[in-house]
Amino acid sequence: MSIEERVKKIIVDQLGVKAEDVKPEASFIEDLGADSLDTVELVMALEEEFDIEIPDEEAEKITTVQSAIDYVAKANA
């Protein structure tokens, strides 16, 4: 599975949304119905899946599907 596929799977699992709704431009809060707790849990799941640490100031910038994919890809580069 690619990084993009793994990130999307985590989003589907964490937020309970349909895979077809997880588009690159989708906002976790506005488009996928997440709240602040959901976004914290999502960041923790990304950290665990990819064995990375995402500082709070960086986590605040991860607001869309694409921003999560980009961050993880950069962290794994």
UniProtKB/Swiss-Prot annotation:
Subcellular location: Cytoplasm
InterPro entries: ACP, ACP-like_sf, PKS_PP-bd, PP-bd_ACP, Ppantetheine_attach_site
Modified residues (O-(pantetheine 4'-phosphoryl)serine): S36
Record has Lipid metabolism as a keyword: yes
GO molecular function: acyl binding; acyl carrier activity; phosphopantetheine binding
Pathway terms, separated by semicolons: Lipid metabolism; fatty acid biosynthesis
GO cellular component terms, A-Z: cytosol; membrane
Entry keywords, A to Z: Cytoplasm, Fatty acid biosynthesis, Fatty acid metabolism, Lipid biosynthesis, Lipid metabolism, Phosphopantetheine, Phosphoprotein
Principal subcellular localization: cytoplasm
Post-translational modification: 4'-phosphopantetheine is transferred from CoA to a specific serine of apo-ACP by AcpS. This modification is essential for activity because fatty acids are bound in thioester linkage to the sulfhydryl of the prosthetic group.
Superkingdom: Bacteria
Xref: Gene3D superfamilies: ACP-like
The Carrier domain, residue ranges: 1-76
Short name of any one Pfam family annotated for the protein: PP-binding
GO biological process annotation, one example: lipid A biosynthetic process
Cited SUPFAM superfamilies: ACP-like
Family according to the record: Belongs to the acyl carrier protein (ACP) family.
Job of this protein: Carrier of the growing fatty acid chain in fatty acid biosynthesis.
Identification of the protein by name: Acyl carrier protein
Lineage: Bacteria, Pseudomonadati, Pseudomonadota, Gammaproteobacteria, Pasteurellales
Name of the gene encoding the protein in the UniProt record: acpP
